């Protein structure tokens, strides 16, 4: 990175005022108008900002586009509607509640006034106004909002007050129907929301709302119950070291976990609960239940509803899963992914259920107590699971299977275990012996993260009738749902989606039958309440409607919007689908006892009805668009969370590889879900996004046919981004329509107010004015308004606009030569700033900024990439996407930062780079070392091991390492293990490189004779120099990315680099011998002479140790005059070569390179560690920079190296770009722009006058001045 200077301190603007003292007599009164003048004087500014930079339309659109507009609109309009519902309610208790709330608000207001008066008897009106400003700006709006907030909260509590009691059977006297598993078929169409309080005149109204909200939750959140059983890992009595190789793994790393699972042999349990024994019992019961298709006493199942109950002894539970909680409820991402896979597996494979009975045959004679881990490991050389279970040829492990081939360097088994000879050992030891035997043989052991049990009723020729196969295997026969087994961090888990085969219907338009899904949830809810399953050792409860339930948590998010949507849809009785709620309304009616007309209970109150209709008429199109956008953003957030969790999991294993701790990986493996070329996981993402084409994949983790692979791995990121843009545009268009209709104007609500409020100039509506006030508050606080203000300076200053191409967002005129280099630098910088680079996909080549794809081209490329044999994206393609993603977010200040950077670059370059020259003259005075450098990882004699790991370059061994583009430096793209499970396995990483500047590159710093020859012959291949560090200065103000090893060599130990034939660079910072001689001769300080002595010692190996020594009396051994004389004599005898600049390769030694004459000098240079404690070897290319170079900078720098620090033009331009990225430099340049803007617009002050304190607080005094001061 280029030299950067510490942030220049700015002189804060100071304002002072003269206080006035008022002497008040006992009989006088206070003239508050004089004591507290209007804070924003009308004659100066009643508006957000001077020059109309921020106007009402900007503020309102910012609030509406941000999505917060829905809450502001409904907080007022729906609160007002509810006030009418309370007022005219037939239930006197309801109308009385309104009166109580109104009295409470009055009391709260009185208390507020009293409190502020007690705190300050003089300034209390100002403090009260601050409270008003948070609620619309005046007393009336404050009271209204306080009342509306109370009504909305109370209304919600009334709705959910008795929801549990309202869920029952149509015939409530037959309580056994819903609580006995043998009778669950009798609940069909009989589980309803029924008004349980017939004396409540609002009972039917609330019951309808309950059914509607429950239906909306079910359709939006897709909740279902997950039957879960777990079998904890147990260490053998002899410890984990008896089965794993503790010496190879390390005792501290060997713990029961996903990587090192174990089960205790039943013979070792000593009466304690044994997980292996329980698992065997569970598995047999489950297989029996699935093969018979009948209801079993110990694994209660039913053929119609696909319901299953696990016994308590299996640590069983029913977990309510929804798309918003699946990642938090389940402990690890592989568990969540397995459940998602099971969901889609059922959705896409089931045709109809079967009750065909199959015969279960136990294999292996009378042997039992098999190790549960046997289910997760297979041999590729036979049709057998690791122990006894048979597999058919069609199900055997192939390269298409999503298992993971065990590597002996990962899974280290105790070497003392052997499968030779007779085996009288326990079953647990037998299992591990066979695992060890596989490790020692040519066979490949394949392990699985999760497996699914399948019934082979159609395959009579197979010995066993029940198998466990990987999640990637497809089943075509008709069958009952088969649970999935998953390896967790602490146990093996069994998962079964309760009723999954019953309510998931691939043939239906919605992929699931909402009515059946509701039936399963409600039936289980009633069962859990009565819990008559104790005789079967089964018990559970389902918290469906409690205050902490998922349903209530969902209802508490955006409550007002949900209530408004429910009521307005019910008002139409679902006759139209304008708000996308017809499915919800249809389900709600089915869940009500009489399929009632939902609108009847609302229309009984005409005023309430009219108010709802008015809201719908005024705001429906905007609310619908904003709600759709918000829901999609929530889906994307869930998808991002899932993908990040998978990436984090993979990176944990990559880290072990990087640290050469492969033995700690053990049973660790990639997850079996394929990642698309754009870094997304389409098969899992579809669970969260209702808009995805779920029918495009046959089975979402299947790898059996080309068609299935294609559809399953189709990239989704660009498609989602395009959808997000479309929805965002729709919201912006609807917001624009509202703002144009309102025609808002500014006013100051009080002489004590520090803020600006809005009102409609066209509509005389107090509630609308209150909405505008709320929108103003939220709009100002969005990043959009502040960014518009900041960007105004650039867009309204001639020196910037004259040199900025607004259509292409790049420089023009005399600065256009910088565009390619700017893109290069900013793209790579955005790429480096990514915390998860893997999520943007993969690349093979660097590419070029002149050939980077547009966003549309990238989208088309991603969509077609599944048909290509290779990934066509380049690094600069992906880096551009990262940069554009930053730039497009309106709430971020990326565009402001970008223009601020461009302004800084123009400021540095103008007038012959004079400002850059001024900065460098301060930073590199005579005697200060500085250099430009490049650093790469390098080992000229790599060991066999390192050479094996380093395969990222196919270049010739003689290629200069600085010219080499590395595809996978330091595991940037993962490892050859393919931990991310990409379509294309990443290339093996280059483990030598550990530099943040790996992909920062420039032109070659010298004129390479070979490259010039190729160019003359018509070759267009351009060689770059990678690992660019920029300018490094030996100064406390310097910020450099050069390695500590390199700076130590050049700043402190240069004497160790010089030889009898290569003395250049030792004292080049002094230009020549005379300059250094003169500085020493002028010195009048003993300490300075000692410093010169130390310099000569470190630079040219002169023995100067005696110069700073003292005698026993504390006196210098050598007098001041003799020191000076000695040092001057040393300088006189120095070879002039010491003062020549050095350019060339530097490590523990150095090799000069002048004008490309020694381009292979790197072969003779010994490398240096990256840092003092690093084993990574690095090599650097260095060009020294001196004060004399700085002084020669001039307007001719583009044509003469002597005027560009002795560097090629492109490298000098790269330094200017790096300096422009420095915040301190940007601040200086921006202040210069502000001064020019002031002069151009003939303002009294440099900053812009701002009339709203909220806006001023956000902008700060560099950009704005508070109008209250004038």
Swiss-Prot record:
Residues 92-123, 175-204 form a coiled coil. One of its GO terms (cellular component) is plasma membrane. Disruption phenotype: Probably essential, it was not disrupted in a global transposon mutagenesis study. Residues 1-26 form the signal peptide. PROSITE patterns: PROKAR_LIPOPROTEIN. A lipid is attached at residue 27 (N-palmitoyl cysteine). Pfam families: DUF3713. It comes from the Bacteria. Residues 942-967 are annotated as: Disordered. Keywords: Cell membrane, Coiled coil, Lipoprotein, Membrane, Palmitate, Signal. Residues 958-967 have a biased composition (Polar residues). It is found in: Cell membrane. Residues 943-957 have a biased composition (Low complexity). This is Uncharacterized lipoprotein MG338. It comes from Mycoplasma genitalium (strain ATCC 33530 / DSM 19775 / NCTC 10195 / G37) (Mycoplasmoides genitalium).
